[in-house]
């Protein structure tokens, strides 16, 4: 145990003395965060001073939410951002890729809903691979049953129905079994791609 103050698997201890630097971490991620702290100390202090540091997060999850639905964001941008996240010890990236104004990841279930600019599945796999290198979890965010204008452009028949029998353009009709099965098929496709949690509501 790094410290009795926490059971966090991101806790680490740094001991600096005349014999050098000793870093002990509760996990691989903890060791990485310890190295980041050493890097920061060397830059800010122009070297290291003797002493002991015991560090651990107050919040187990530190998430960056990126809206890549309303505006296309490239794979290269995500790769750079993941490296920056590591320096800031942010351990979760939420990719909000579907919205009223866009659907930005390749969709094999229904290509008609995808925006003109989008990330391919191979690009997403590269993003996830890079995130894994830095101990960062990637969570997809697929808006539903609201904020689905982009989907309903292709499938207006799945929209909510008003008292006058007209379809709304912004909300999925969850009383329609076909609409429910359709959105479920999208969930399954992206759960298979990301192999992680999936966020299925408005942010």
Task: Locate the predicted segments by residue.
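Contiguous, structured surface segment used for ligand recognition
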Residues: 1-59
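Catalytic domains of carbohydrate-active enzymes, especially glycoside hydrolases
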Residues: 77-99
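Generic structural signal for well-ordered alpha-helices
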Residues: 82, 124-128, 184-191
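Aromatic- and acidic-residue-enriched carbohydrate-binding clefts of CAZyme catalytic domains
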Residues: 98-134, 147-181
């Amino acid at each position: 145990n790094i410290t009795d103050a926490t059971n966090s698997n991101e806790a680490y201890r740094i001991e600096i003395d005349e014999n050098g630097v000793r870093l002990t971490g509760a996990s691989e991620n903890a060791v990485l965060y310890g190295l980041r702290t050493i890097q920061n100390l060397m830059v800010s202090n122009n070297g290291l001073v003797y002493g002991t540091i015991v560090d651990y997060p107050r919040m187990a999850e530190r998430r960056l939410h990126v809206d890549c639905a309303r505006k296309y964001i490239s794979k290269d941008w995500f790769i750079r951002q993941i490296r920056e996240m590591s320096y800031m010890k942010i351990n979760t990236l939420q990719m909000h890729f579907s919205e009223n104004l866009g659907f930005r990841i390749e969709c094999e279930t229904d290509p008609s809903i995808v925006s003109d600019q989008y990330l391919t599945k191979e690009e997403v796999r590269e993003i996830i691979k890079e995130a894994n290198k830095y101990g960062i979890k990637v969570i997809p965010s697929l808006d539903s049953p609201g904020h689905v204008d982009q989907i309903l452009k292709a499938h207006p028949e799945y929209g909510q129905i008003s008292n006058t029998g007209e379809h709304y353009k912004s909300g999925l009709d969850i009383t329609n079994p076909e609409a429910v099965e359709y959105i479920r098929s999208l969930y399954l496709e992206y759960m298979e791609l990301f192999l992680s949690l999936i966020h299925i509501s408005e942010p």
